[in-house]
């Protein structure tokens, strides 16, 4: 009985080693190398998502580093910004991509997206008191509520300089025009 128990225990340990990949006498060295060389899970679509996440994280870090910077009409940074100067400066610093000089130019030249498609790093556009129904203000999306589609954004405000606002704030809720994505 003891012998049978010992044999059964040894077989179980042997099987657990095979299941963990420790021992497999039938596996040829070529198969083992092919298995080791298969890094598709690293370099496949997931890797692209990781790169996009890192780019967005760096973009937002650059944007946040300017919180509190004063507003000045026509200023392109880094000591002062207007709204489009802020967005173009942040994108130029982090991606070396020119997204347009004015809020209207940025709205016209970048890829349109719906509010439901908003992601961190997208540009959001609003009218301004002087622009009538036309685009007159721009910011960069910080966060989006997928249920309500409300979002927070960082922008250069005429009264407060670079700050974070919410799309539900009374000054922005009715002025939203649309959103654009920067193709990197």
Residue ranges and their predicted role:
Residues 14-16:
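N-terminal signal peptide c-region/cleavage motif recognized by signal peptidases
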Residues 30-61, 65, 72, 76:
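N-terminal targeting signals for Sec/Tat export/insertion, comprising classic cleavable signal peptides
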Residues 49, 69-120:
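Catalytic cysteine-centered active-site loop
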Residues 11, 78, 106, 160, ...:
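Residue-level detector of flexible, active-site-proximal loop/helix-junction positions
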Residues 4-7, 18-34, 38-39, 48, ...:
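Aromatic- and glycine-rich peptidoglycan recognition patches
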């Amino acid at each position: 009985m003891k012998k049978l128990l010992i044999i059964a225990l040894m077989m179980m340990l042997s099987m657990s080693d095979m299941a963990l990949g420790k021992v497999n006498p039938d596996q040829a060295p070529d198969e083992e190398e092919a298995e080791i060389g298969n890094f598709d899970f690293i370099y496949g679509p997931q890797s692209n998502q990781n790169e996009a996440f890192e780019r967005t994280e760096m973009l937002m870090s650059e944007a946040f580093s300017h919180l509190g910077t004063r507003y000045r009409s026509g200023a392109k940074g880094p000591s002062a910004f207007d709204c489009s100067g802020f967005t173009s400066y942040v994108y130029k610093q982090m991606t070396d991509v020119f997204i347009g000089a004015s809020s209207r130019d940025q709205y016209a030249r970048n890829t349109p997206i719906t509010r439901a498609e908003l992601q961190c790093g997208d540009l959001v556009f609003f009218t301004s008191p002087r622009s009538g129904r036309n685009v007159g203000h721009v910011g960069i999306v910080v966060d989006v509520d997928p249920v309500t589609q409300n979002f927070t954004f960082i922008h250069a405000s005429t009264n407060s300089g670079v700050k974070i606002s919410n799309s539900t704030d009374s000054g922005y809720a009715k002025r939203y025009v649309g959103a654009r994505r920067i193709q990197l």
